[in-house]
Amino acid sequence: MKKVATSLLLMLIAIGSWAQKVWNNPSFEQNLYSSNLNITDVEFKPNETILHLNIKAYHKNWQRFASASFLKTPDGKTYAITGGKATREGEDDYTPDSLYYTSATNDEGNIALQFEPLPAKTKTFDFIEGYEERAFGLLDITDPAIILSSPNWRNTATGDWILGLYNDVAVYDSKVWKYAQKTDKKVVLTDGKENITITIGKEKNGEREFTINGKKQALAMFRSQTLPYYPTPDTTSFSTEIKEGEAILTGYVRNITPQHINRNLRIEIRTPNVVKGDMAEEFTTTIDSLGKFEIKIPLLGTQVVHVFCKYDQSSYAASANTILTPNGKYFILADMNTKRMMFMGDDARLQNELLTRETLGVPYGGWIDGYACNDSILKIANMWISNYDINVKQLNEYAAKHPNVSKRFLDFHYENRRFGALSNIMMLKYSSVDRTLPEELSGWIEKNSAINPNMPLVLCDYICSFLRYARENATEKSPLMKLSRRQPDGFLWLESKGLLKLTDKEHAAIDQAKEAQKEINNLLLSKKDRKELNEVGNKINEKYAACNEVIDSITRRQDFMNAYHDKVKNGYFYVQHQVVNSEFPDEPLHSIHCSQILSEFMDHERMPLTDNLIPILDDIKIPLFKEIVMRQNDHYKNILKGKEEAVNAVIHPSSDVEGLTDGKAILDKLVEPYKGKIVYLDIWGTWCGPCKNKLKKSHKLKAELKDYDIVYLYLANRSPEESWKNVIGEYNLTEPNCVHYNLPPKQQRAIEQYVKITGYPTYRLIDRKGGLHHLKWTDDEDLPKFKKTLDELP
């Protein structure tokens, strides 16, 4: 009896100790998808563990916790969610898998989530919402009694991130250190050459006194996804200087797993280039076994830089849109678990402010799939205008709420959102049947599109796309463009200039051609499928065949050809320059447009500037921009230097299929020499940006597939011979297993119809027996799945 009583007493004591175990305000790490969650308490009970959560929902968002949610301890064991019943006053009942809306009046609420009981000796655990790869979570939830329960510490006077004390390494002074010693009160860091001694004092008013190599400073731990707001104002302005230089970005990637390594984990950088237009530059570097990396980033001034911690072909674990300056040195932390990214250094304030998520609630204005009438375009454009006004109001409210936020942060966001709205509105021109915006929008665009002389020209990437769209829009409206396309208004414009005389019969034919164009436009707006569009379009062409013959006869007249070549010369890019001279004559816009015209010509054609375009160089008044364009021209002048023999060895003559007209017969003849091998068919064009981007990166794919006996068959669509050879040489597509053809248009079209292409690039696999297999153009980005497809081929 005494033994039973003793056991009962011990059990009661154990239950009592459970009931008293509560973590108040435990430390934890937020990941990218949980920045609005805060753990106020953790209750440990013998039959359950309870998480008490405060939820903030910016812009009236909702929250959902999956019924698959669980707690996870360091040994890998999981403890499932069992309910969401309120246990305290002020909490709301919650049912897992349902949507939880916070109060409309204060945008926050409180709930309690119950889980299977954690072990009594638990010191740290994770809360993970489901098993999806990007499920949100609260990680490293740690007993607050542990002094170093949060690894990240900031200087309370300056707001800067000073120290990261992680399990395996430390981050201090923009470097990664190993531990020579680590206790709750003393840490010694070493890099093998230098030691840093850190002593940690007692907590007082949320701070601890750290002594780092004899220097004392008050630090406070933080666990938010981004740094807390800075305590002092910063009125520094951006430098507007245009200059070339490299920013050096070093960093540390935490919580890398073997799976990440196997999936080609890397750092990828994208930077806009205002000289080259809407073409982002890309730079990549590897991450070493400790998680460290360094990359040099060429810049043209203070500008936006997009940083991605990527794996596989296109997946990314963390990302940051930041601003860097030539010759600047920066350090960034990327965490694979929490998705956190933070900057450390003497001049990292702007970079950390830009990582805040609170300002990112930008409403989407909408897009139009396919062609639309002007009324529909205006409706979407007005939504973008309304949303821009909302954006400005949000920024004003944000500035009032956070008076210490830096001037550069606000200046950038105002500028970026302005050009973001302009770019998205201008992009709606692609939904118009004549590729131009309704005139009703020109006033708003003109009013809001001025270049701010107090901001760096190269700062925002949206300015690159906006300028290109604006130039294209003006070009499409130009009579020169209509002349270039031999449209009715082009003939009438030549007549108005006294350069062409038209007969009554020719005027009648031009009037009929205008009616034909109206019918075509109405057909495009009808939303018919591709087959029906072709059928009806052919009927319209038959209906107006007689007037088309008259117009064709005009184009064969010598007076027309003389006027045409005088006004249009080298085609689209020459016409663009004429339009820029009349529509955008003021600096610096004129120089930017001229730079982009020449750069885009070379990128599109993959060849140096023609004689008709070289004089445009003198119109570029910004010396650095002109120098960059000239370097690009020299690159294409010398692109085949030393490569002619290799290129000629892999290009094949179209005479191989001479006389064949059937698409299947032509393709069978092309692949006949490679029976018994897998053929990877790539249908591309020198004019196709996505095609060239994939070709540029194709060597990585080929390296991954080196164990397969693959022949890479490249068929170029509508590609000038010089451009075609230049692309082959530029991207070194000259391996022995590469085969290149530039077939006559009819034969190329026959193959494309046979393989049923829907766009460019198009990829197909031809198995060892000659069977044709369809591929989506992104299928090769999932390598394990793609290799499985190859393994299953006969």
Identify the residue ranges that each predicted region occupies:
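Short, solvent-exposed, Trp/other aromatic-anchored flexible loops in extracytoplasmic proteins
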Residues: 83-124, 131-132
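Conserved redox-active cysteine motifs that mediate thiol-disulfide chemistry
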Residues: 675, 683-700, 717-719
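Oxidative protein folding and maturation machinery
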Residues: 336-673
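Conserved helix-turn-beta segment immediately C-terminal to the redox Cys motif
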Residues: 677, 695-715, 793
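Short, internal strand/loop/helix patches
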Residues: 568, 728-768
